[in-house]
Amino acid sequence: MNYIELHNISKTYDKGKVLAVNNISLSVSEGEIFGLIGPDGAGKTSIFRMLTTLIIPDSGSAKVLGYDVVKDFRQIRNEVGYMPGRFSLYPDLSVEENLRFYATMFGTTIEENYHLIRDIYVQIEAFGKRKAGQLSGGMKQKLALCCALIHKPKVLFLDEPTTGIDPVSRKELWEMLRKLKTENICIFVSTPYMDEALQCDRIALIQQGEILSIDSPQAVVGQFDKFIYAVSSDDTYKQLKVLMQYPERLNSYPFGEFAHLVVAGELDEIRLGEFLKNNGLNDIRINRINATIEDCFIDLSRQTKV
């Protein structure tokens, strides 16, 4: 069963001058972790705000749990959990007070649904009397997740939940989401971090308000039909400029300590090495590698511009 459905949704701002979401359609099923993957400004938050009934789409239709996001906003708000990108709990209330407030607001108690938040809450329980505004970034996110889950929602919306928190907290949060999946909760999560795509059952890559691809992370990578080589040398900046002149180059870009060179077919690595050396580069290393989600995103973005 589809818990989330979007049909040709569009959204503009500034009296139609800024197109944030352009004719997007997708669906998310019960018990699925679905990732909306893209950089800042891609349209992720606008989609989340439409689905959580905070803003109205300009055109198209969307349903959450069978309810229309415009006509049935009250029903949707009662049955979903939403964790916005910006910390939005009450900073002057303690951890316990925030949690009890949200439980009361939804007509439930902490005890009734404690099994849903237990694994998360035990990590912040020692700070129960501390004001929420005084928590670390990772602790704030854990508290926000507890508050979003306390009424046992069928759909959980998480807008960039790992932005601004440390790597350990990021790892712990994804482990928590995988446990929640076993409760058949539909989890719709957005992130600018391409590596987090692998944590999802399916993903939608989004750029400038348009969907580039929707599939499982493995299928997205499997559809990459080019060859990628990781290249390094003694001068990273010069190396990028030189690679732009290579005849077989389709694309090249920095990737950590390497440059990724994208070509249509298998390369003669010796010939490439000589080309780089003849252009003043030394300590050259060339390795053919498998595409990552980020490589796929860059390639799909490039195709839409051609």
Predicted feature locations:
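Short loop/turn motifs at secondary-structure junctions
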Residues: 5, 79, 152, 199, ...
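Generic beta-strand hydrophobic packing signal
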Residues: 9, 24, 203, 252, ...
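Long alpha-helical scaffolds
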Residues: 3, 20, 62, 239-242
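Short, charged/small-residue-rich alpha-helical element at the C-terminal edge
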Residues: 228-306
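Conserved N-terminal strand/loop that marks the beginning of ABC ATPase nucleotide-binding domains
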Residues: 1-9
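ABC transporter nucleotide-binding domain
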Residues: 175-264
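Conserved protein kinase catalytic domain
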Residues: 77, 118, 221, 297-298
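ABC transporter nucleotide-binding domains
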Residues: 11-189, 194-206, 213
